[in-house]
UniProtKB/Swiss-Prot annotation:
EC number(s) per entry: 3.2.1.37
UniProt xrefs under Gene3D superfamilies: Glycosidases (3.20.20.80), Glycosyl hydrolase domain, family 39 (2.60.40.1500)
Gene giving rise to this polypeptide: xynB
Protein name listed in UniProt: Beta-xylosidase
Pathway membership, UniProt: Glycan degradation; xylan degradation
Species per Swiss-Prot/TrEMBL record: Thermoanaerobacterium saccharolyticum
Gene Ontology annotations of biological process type: xylan catabolic process
UniProt cross-references to Pfam families, sorted A to Z: Glyco_hydro_39 (PF01229)
Length: 500
């Protein structure tokens, strides 16, 4: 039995930096109906502020084209699709966190590509044309959306240049050249636009030290530092899936802390630090993303991550995503909070539960967060991620919660292996790759948390709450004041109803 007495007052604040940004598949996917419908659903339930994805300058979005006029090759900038995409984002109420990349093929110095959709990852063959392209894009955004709006958009240069898959030869010197040219082009458009990088993945934090030293020594603009984070080890690959061991959540939080210290010890100690991608695994084919384990595991990251970073962006909001080809089945290990056919995964509800939290942080430990909201109500989240196979994964809790009203209404929402787990039901169905409409409806129905309510009375300003958390459970308790209007019903007597 784990016993906790929550204090009645705290001067600590719970940060909502966890919902600053969310990741997306390549921007061209935003032209699909299901993508936009899913983004609306996620925005309504979780209220992310920004969205970040690859492919702004890739050929499917179509911004960079070339026309041959006599003996001259002239660039042509086509904003038809990006206008549709960014218009949709802003209409939904979410702003772009703009990743500048990858390389348009007509401007590329080589043919190396990444992903099924062939994003070119080579440097520009003409840095002057690249600079002109960046400036043209920024001028267009400002013309269409206004400078006050565009000044709110961060501009991140490239994606994971420390990996050969994402930047030819993982050439640090060449990336710094790209960054310098791009950052100066952005500042030439407007010196108040925010630009940053290097957007590396884990295992290469020396890049951040080198990057900040380079910016200082070369007088290159930098307004924020960005990095990615996952906690999976090398895996066992199959043609359709990958299985990886996931390290404890402390590993990711320590990565956040480490980079924050690097920044503090640099020539730019006060720079904002954004984790622009994070998840358990770096592969969109790892079934862990579909599970209640993922939901329980991510809870601690949401609870504590904001202590160390200015934002951390979950990768991604939807399984409408095509890095390794078009998805081959309903559940396939995709990154998304929401599976194909708009079926919310357990991790979606972890985020939704955190969206119910208040600002006053009354209590926090490695498996629980208790907050008070502006109206005096209290919200508690607890989780029980089970890292290893065990015969007795359950945890019993007894929590004394301070409440500022005697009559209490409790709403409890629970996800675990048996509740809010459409992946489990899909397995029961026989893992249909392309489920029927009836099967999709069933999966949507079982994706919802279990909800229970009660009406206890608080004594001496405290309520004693007892509960059990099973394997990979995440629970949300909301304690609000109960307003009883029963006396307004003339002749009310429930005992006259048969069986009551």
């Amino acid at each position: 039995m784990i016993k906790v007495r929550v204090p009645d007052f705290s001067d600590k604040k719970f940060s909502d930096r966890w919902r600053y940004c969310v990741g997306t598949g390549r921007l061209g996917l935003a032209l699909q109906k299901e993508y936009i419908e899913t983004l609306k659903y996620v925005k309504e339930n979780i209220d992310f502020k920004y969205i970040r994805g690859h492919g702004l300058l890739c050929d499917d979005v179509g911004i960079y084209r070339e026309d041959v006029v006599g003996d001259e090759v002239k660039p042509f900038y086509n904003f038809t699709y990006i206008d549709r995409i960014f218009d949709s984002f802003l209409e939904i109420g979410i702003r772009p966190f703009v990743e500048i990349g990858f390389m348009p093929k007509k401007l590329a110095s080589g043919t190396q590509t990444v992903f099924y959709w062939e994003g070119n990852v080579t440097p520009p063959k003409d840095y002057e044309k690249w600079s002109d392209l960046v400036k043209a894009v920024l001028h267009h955004f400002i013309s269409r959306y206004g400078i006050e709006e565009v000044l709110k958009w961060p501009f991140e240069i490239w994606n994971e240049p420390n990996l050969k898959e994402f930047w030819k030869d993982a050439d640090e010197k060449e990336y710094f050249k790209l960054y310098k040219v791009t950052a100066k082009a952005i500042k030439e458009v407007n010196e108040n636009l925010k630009v940053g990088g290097p957007a590396i993945c884990g295992g290469a934090d020396y890049w951040i030290e080198d990057f900040l030293n380079f910016c200082y020594e070369e007088n290159v603009p930098v307004d924020f530092v960005s990095r990615h984070a996952t906690t999976s080890k090398q895996g066992e690959y199959t043609p359709h899936l990958i299985y990886q061991e996931i390290m404890p959540s402390e590993y990711m939080l320590n990565e956040f802390k480490t980079v924050r210290e690097i920044i503090k010890n640099s020539h730019f100690p006060n720079l904002p630090f954004h984790i622009t991608e994070y998840n358990t695994s770096y592969s969109p084919q790892n079934p862990v993303h579909d599970t209640p384990f993922n939901a329980a595991y991510i809870a601690r990251i949401l609870s504590e991550g904001g202590d160390y970073v200015d934002s951390f962006s979950y990768w991604t909001f939807s399984d409408v995503f095509e890095e390794r080809d078009v998805p081959r089945s309903q559940f396939h290990g995709g990154f998304g909070l929401v599976a194909l056919n708009m079926i919310p995964k357990p991790t979606f509800y972890t985020f939704k539960f955190f969206n119910a939290m208040g600002e006053e942080m009354l209590y926090r430990d490695e498996h629980m967060l208790v907050t008070r909201r502006d109206d005096g109500s209290v919200a508690l989240i607890a989780w029980n991620e089970v890292m290893d196979k065990t015969e007795n994964p359950d945890e019993d809790y007894e929590v004394e919660i301070p409440v500022r009203f005697r009559d209490v209404f409790i709403k409890r929402q629970l996800i675990d292996e048996e509740h809010g787990n459409p992946w489990g039901t899909w397995i029961h169905m026989g893992r249909p790759r392309y489920p029927s409409k009836e099967q999709v409806n069933t999966l949507r129905e079982v994706a919802k948390p279990e909800i229970m309510t009660s009406q206890p009375v608080a004594n001496d300003g405290y309520l004693n709450l007892k509960f059990k958390l099973g394997k990979n459970a995440v629970v949300l308790y909301e304690l609000t004041e109960r307003i009883d209007e029963s006396s307004t019903y003339i002749g009310l007597d429930d005992s006259k109803i048969n069986g009551y």
